[in-house]
Amino acid sequence: MIKQRTLKRIVQATGVGLHTGKKVTLTLRPAPANTGVIYRRTDLNPPVDFPADAKSVRDTMLCTCLVNEHDVRISTVEHLNAALAGLGIDNIIVEVDAPEIPIMDGSAAPFVYLLLDAGINELNCAKKFVRIKETVRVEDGDKWAEFKPYNGFSLDFTIDFNHPAIDASTQRYTLNFSADAFMRQISRARTFGFMRDIEYLQSRGLCLGGSFDCAIVVDDYRVLNEDGLRFEDEFVRHKMLDAIGDLFMCGHNIIGAFTAYKSGHALNNKLLQAVLAKQEAWEYVTFEDDAKLPMAFRAPSMVLA
C-alpha cells in the first residue's frame, strides 16, 4: 500500500518576511493521518488555522495568500507548498509567528532541506491522489492552462516575457515529475522581480523584505544579482515551481499532464478549481499494490531513509 506521509520530528527555522522585512520563526510539525496541510498563525490569539484549500487562495502582486471567512490571511505560502508537493507530504502543521511564511532565498530549496532534516514518516493509512479523467482548460486572454489524463505527473510550461535578460534564456521547460527531479531541477529556482517595482513598493512600505538575497532582480536590461542565475532558464523553472505549489493547494498530489502558457498563480488556481468543480473530470485513487503507482510518485530512497 502507498502510505500517507508526515514528518518524523518537529523542525524550526527563521527567515525574513517578504512584506514586513521582519524576522519570522517557522515551525514544521508532524500531523496524524488525514489531517492534511494546515498553515497556522501563532501571532494571533487564539491561533488561526488555514487548511490548504483551492477556494481559500487569493493571488496578490507579491505572493499567494490563504484567506479565511473572517478575511484573516496568511501570505507567501507558495514556495513551501511546492516543497510539500515535491516530497509528497500529506499531513503537516506549518506554524509561523507572523502574517507570512518567510521568503528564505526566494526558492523552495531551504524548505526541502528543512523537510529532509525533519525526516519523513509513513503513516499506516492509504495516500489519496487526485487522478485527472477528462481534459479541463482555462483561459485568460492569450494565457491558458490545462490538465489532461496521464498516468504520472508531467508539466510543460512556457513563459513569454518581453525582456532582454529573459528573452536570452529558454522560455519553455518540461518536466516528468518525481521527487528527485523536483529537488534537482526545480526546487532551487528563485522568484524574480523588477528593480523598479521593488523600489516603488518599498516607497509605499510594502515588500520590505525584498532584496538580492531572496529574488532574481532585473532592471530593464539585465540581471542585477552579482552571482547571476542558478540555471540558464531559472525564470521559467521558477514559474513551474510556483505551479507545482499552486496545484498542491487541493492537498493531494495530482496524476495528470499539466500544460501552461504564460500562466501564473491566479490562472493555476482557476484551473485547479475548474477541475475540482467538474465531478466527472477527476477521482480520488489509492494504491494497494505498490507496483501500480506511477513512477512519478515512487519515493526516492533518500527521502524515506
From Swiss-Prot:
It comes from the Bacteria. The keyword Lipid metabolism applies. Pathway: Glycolipid biosynthesis; lipid IV(A) biosynthesis; lipid IV(A) from (3R)-3-hydroxytetradecanoyl-[acyl-carrier-protein] and UDP-N-acetyl-alpha-D-glucosamine: step 2/6. Keywords: Hydrolase, Lipid A biosynthesis, Lipid biosynthesis, Lipid metabolism, Metal-binding, Zinc. It catalyses: a UDP-3-O-[(3R)-3-hydroxyacyl]-N-acetyl-alpha-D-glucosamine + H2O = a UDP-3-O-[(3R)-3-hydroxyacyl]-alpha-D-glucosamine + acetate. Its cofactor is Zn(2+). Its EC number is 3.5.1.108. The active site is at 265 (proton donor). Disulfide bonds: none annotated. InterPro entries: Ribosomal_Su5_D2-typ_SF, UDP-acyl_GlcNac_deAcase, UDP-acyl_GlcNac_deAcase_C, UDP-acyl_N-AcGlcN_deAcase_N. Pfam families: LpxC. One of its GO terms (cellular component) is membrane. The keyword Ribonucleoprotein does not apply. One of its GO terms (biological process) is lipid A biosynthetic process. Zn(2+) binds at residues 79, 238, 242. One of its GO terms (molecular function) is metal ion binding. Catalyzes the hydrolysis of UDP-3-O-myristoyl-N-acetylglucosamine to form UDP-3-O-myristoylglucosamine and acetate, the committed step in lipid A biosynthesis. Belongs to the LpxC family. This is UDP-3-O-acyl-N-acetylglucosamine deacetylase. The lineage of its organism: Bacteria, Pseudomonadati, Pseudomonadota, Gammaproteobacteria, Enterobacterales. The gene is lpxC.
